[in-house]
Amino acid sequence: MIITTPAPESASDAVAQMYEEDIAADGFVHAYTAAMAVNPEAHDAFVALVRAVVPSIGVRIYEAATLGAARAIGSAHCLIAHGRKSMTAGVVDEAGLRAFAADDDSAFTDAERAVIRYAERLSSSPQDMTDADAAALREHGLTDRQIVDITLAAGLRNHFSRSLMALTVPLDDDPLIAPELAAALRRRAERRAQ
Protein backbone atom coordinates (compact mmCIF):
# COMPACT_ATOMS: atom_id res chain seq x y z
CA MET A 1 0.00 0.00 0.00
CA ILE A 2 1.36 3.41 -0.92
CA ILE A 3 -0.06 5.08 2.21
CA THR A 4 0.21 4.55 5.95
CA THR A 5 -3.11 3.71 7.56
CA PRO A 6 -4.25 4.66 11.07
CA ALA A 7 -3.10 2.22 13.75
CA PRO A 8 -5.99 0.78 15.77
CA GLU A 9 -4.41 1.75 19.08
CA SER A 10 -4.17 5.42 18.15
CA ALA A 11 -7.32 5.70 16.03
CA SER A 12 -9.60 8.71 16.35
CA ASP A 13 -13.20 8.09 17.37
CA ALA A 14 -14.37 8.06 13.74
CA VAL A 15 -11.64 5.64 12.67
CA ALA A 16 -12.18 3.44 15.71
CA GLN A 17 -15.86 3.21 14.78
CA MET A 18 -14.99 2.15 11.21
CA TYR A 19 -12.67 -0.54 12.55
CA GLU A 20 -15.22 -1.71 15.14
CA GLU A 21 -17.92 -2.01 12.46
CA ASP A 22 -15.66 -4.27 10.38
CA ILE A 23 -14.78 -6.41 13.39
CA ALA A 24 -18.44 -6.72 14.42
CA ALA A 25 -19.55 -7.63 10.89
CA ASP A 26 -16.64 -9.72 9.64
CA GLY A 27 -14.30 -10.44 12.54
CA PHE A 28 -11.39 -8.38 11.22
CA VAL A 29 -10.54 -4.96 9.79
CA HIS A 30 -10.44 -5.04 6.00
CA ALA A 31 -7.41 -3.45 4.35
CA TYR A 32 -9.77 -1.30 2.27
CA THR A 33 -11.38 0.03 5.45
CA ALA A 34 -7.98 0.91 6.86
CA ALA A 35 -7.12 2.75 3.64
CA MET A 36 -10.36 4.74 3.68
CA ALA A 37 -9.86 5.46 7.39
CA VAL A 38 -7.15 7.93 6.38
CA ASN A 39 -10.08 10.23 5.51
CA PRO A 40 -13.10 9.04 7.51
CA GLU A 41 -15.20 12.03 6.42
CA ALA A 42 -14.82 11.04 2.76
CA HIS A 43 -15.67 7.44 3.65
CA ASP A 44 -18.80 8.64 5.45
CA ALA A 45 -19.78 10.67 2.37
CA PHE A 46 -19.33 7.59 0.17
CA VAL A 47 -21.51 5.51 2.52
CA ALA A 48 -24.14 8.27 2.50
CA LEU A 49 -24.21 8.21 -1.31
CA VAL A 50 -24.69 4.44 -1.31
CA ARG A 51 -27.52 4.80 1.19
CA ALA A 52 -29.11 7.44 -1.04
CA VAL A 53 -29.31 5.12 -4.08
CA VAL A 54 -30.24 1.77 -2.55
CA PRO A 55 -33.83 2.61 -1.47
CA SER A 56 -35.13 3.08 -5.02
CA ILE A 57 -33.39 0.04 -6.52
CA GLY A 58 -33.11 -2.40 -3.60
CA VAL A 59 -30.22 -4.56 -2.53
CA ARG A 60 -30.48 -7.07 -5.39
CA ILE A 61 -30.20 -4.45 -8.14
CA TYR A 62 -27.54 -2.52 -6.18
CA GLU A 63 -25.40 -5.66 -5.87
CA ALA A 64 -25.93 -6.50 -9.56
CA ALA A 65 -24.70 -3.02 -10.53
CA THR A 66 -21.80 -3.30 -8.10
CA LEU A 67 -20.72 -6.73 -9.31
CA GLY A 68 -21.05 -5.74 -12.96
CA ALA A 69 -18.89 -2.67 -12.44
CA ALA A 70 -16.33 -4.55 -10.34
CA ARG A 71 -16.01 -7.29 -12.97
CA ALA A 72 -15.53 -4.75 -15.77
CA ILE A 73 -12.94 -2.81 -13.78
CA GLY A 74 -11.09 -5.91 -12.64
CA SER A 75 -11.46 -5.18 -8.93
CA ALA A 76 -10.74 -8.31 -6.89
CA HIS A 77 -11.44 -6.36 -3.69
CA CYS A 78 -14.98 -5.50 -4.74
CA LEU A 79 -15.73 -8.80 -6.50
CA ILE A 80 -14.88 -10.68 -3.31
CA ALA A 81 -16.48 -8.25 -0.84
CA HIS A 82 -19.67 -7.81 -2.83
CA GLY A 83 -19.75 -11.42 -3.92
CA ARG A 84 -19.90 -12.30 -0.23
CA LYS A 85 -22.48 -9.59 0.46
CA SER A 86 -24.57 -10.81 -2.49
CA MET A 87 -24.54 -14.37 -1.17
CA THR A 88 -25.42 -13.19 2.35
CA ALA A 89 -28.33 -11.13 0.97
CA GLY A 90 -29.60 -14.08 -1.08
CA VAL A 91 -28.96 -12.38 -4.42
CA VAL A 92 -26.91 -15.31 -5.68
CA ASP A 93 -25.55 -18.55 -4.22
CA GLU A 94 -21.97 -19.81 -4.31
CA ALA A 95 -22.47 -21.74 -7.55
CA GLY A 96 -24.03 -18.68 -9.18
CA LEU A 97 -21.17 -16.47 -8.06
CA ARG A 98 -18.62 -18.99 -9.32
CA ALA A 99 -20.45 -18.93 -12.68
CA PHE A 100 -20.44 -15.10 -12.60
CA ALA A 101 -16.64 -15.24 -12.23
CA ALA A 102 -16.64 -17.27 -15.47
CA ASP A 103 -18.86 -14.68 -17.23
CA ASP A 104 -22.04 -16.74 -16.85
CA ASP A 105 -24.73 -14.49 -15.36
CA SER A 106 -27.54 -17.06 -15.53
CA ALA A 107 -27.95 -17.19 -11.73
CA PHE A 108 -29.28 -13.63 -11.83
CA THR A 109 -32.78 -12.56 -12.90
CA ASP A 110 -33.33 -11.04 -16.35
CA ALA A 111 -33.50 -7.55 -14.82
CA GLU A 112 -30.31 -8.13 -12.82
CA ARG A 113 -28.50 -9.35 -15.95
CA ALA A 114 -29.55 -6.17 -17.75
CA VAL A 115 -28.18 -4.13 -14.84
CA ILE A 116 -24.90 -6.10 -14.89
CA ARG A 117 -24.49 -5.39 -18.63
CA TYR A 118 -25.32 -1.70 -18.09
CA ALA A 119 -22.80 -1.40 -15.24
CA GLU A 120 -20.12 -3.16 -17.30
CA ARG A 121 -20.69 -0.80 -20.22
CA LEU A 122 -20.62 2.24 -17.92
CA SER A 123 -17.34 0.95 -16.46
CA SER A 124 -15.64 0.17 -19.77
CA SER A 125 -17.01 2.52 -22.44
CA PRO A 126 -19.32 5.18 -20.97
CA GLN A 127 -18.68 7.49 -23.91
CA ASP A 128 -20.43 4.98 -26.17
CA MET A 129 -23.63 4.72 -24.13
CA THR A 130 -26.88 5.74 -25.80
CA ASP A 131 -30.61 5.75 -25.18
CA ALA A 132 -30.56 2.06 -26.05
CA ASP A 133 -28.69 1.33 -22.82
CA ALA A 134 -31.41 2.95 -20.73
CA ALA A 135 -34.10 1.34 -22.90
CA ALA A 136 -32.68 -2.09 -22.02
CA LEU A 137 -33.31 -1.27 -18.35
CA ARG A 138 -36.76 0.17 -19.02
CA GLU A 139 -37.73 -3.14 -20.66
CA HIS A 140 -37.53 -4.60 -17.15
CA GLY A 141 -39.77 -1.93 -15.64
CA LEU A 142 -37.01 0.25 -14.25
CA THR A 143 -37.91 3.94 -13.91
CA ASP A 144 -35.82 7.00 -14.70
CA ARG A 145 -35.07 7.42 -10.98
CA GLN A 146 -33.92 3.81 -10.79
CA ILE A 147 -31.79 4.20 -13.92
CA VAL A 148 -30.12 7.24 -12.35
CA ASP A 149 -29.54 5.29 -9.13
CA ILE A 150 -28.17 2.26 -11.01
CA THR A 151 -25.84 4.63 -12.86
CA LEU A 152 -24.75 6.18 -9.57
CA ALA A 153 -24.25 2.74 -7.98
CA ALA A 154 -21.98 1.64 -10.82
CA GLY A 155 -20.20 5.01 -10.76
CA LEU A 156 -19.67 4.73 -7.01
CA ARG A 157 -18.14 1.28 -7.50
CA ASN A 158 -15.80 2.73 -10.11
CA HIS A 159 -14.78 5.43 -7.63
CA PHE A 160 -14.14 3.04 -4.76
CA SER A 161 -12.54 0.22 -6.77
CA ARG A 162 -10.23 2.47 -8.73
CA SER A 163 -9.22 4.31 -5.56
CA LEU A 164 -8.26 1.02 -3.89
CA MET A 165 -6.32 -0.06 -6.96
CA ALA A 166 -4.48 3.28 -7.20
CA LEU A 167 -3.54 3.10 -3.52
CA THR A 168 -2.34 -0.50 -4.06
CA VAL A 169 -4.46 -1.69 -1.15
CA PRO A 170 -3.60 -5.34 -0.45
CA LEU A 171 -6.27 -7.96 -0.92
CA ASP A 172 -7.42 -9.57 2.32
CA ASP A 173 -7.79 -13.30 2.74
CA ASP A 174 -11.48 -13.12 3.60
CA PRO A 175 -12.38 -16.02 5.91
CA LEU A 176 -16.07 -15.49 5.16
CA ILE A 177 -15.86 -16.67 1.54
CA ALA A 178 -14.67 -20.07 0.33
CA PRO A 179 -11.00 -19.88 -0.72
CA GLU A 180 -11.72 -21.52 -4.10
CA LEU A 181 -14.46 -19.00 -4.83
CA ALA A 182 -12.23 -16.09 -3.81
CA ALA A 183 -9.52 -17.48 -6.10
CA ALA A 184 -11.99 -17.67 -9.02
CA LEU A 185 -13.02 -14.04 -8.44
CA ARG A 186 -9.35 -12.97 -8.21
CA ARG A 187 -8.57 -14.75 -11.48
CA ARG A 188 -11.51 -12.98 -13.15
CA ALA A 189 -10.23 -9.62 -11.90
CA GLU A 190 -6.73 -10.40 -13.17
CA ARG A 191 -8.12 -11.25 -16.63
CA ARG A 192 -9.56 -7.73 -16.82
CA ALA A 193 -6.35 -6.16 -15.58
CA GLN A 194 -4.27 -7.68 -18.41
Tell me the role of every PLM-derived stretch.
Residues M1-Q194:
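Hydrophobic alpha-helical segments
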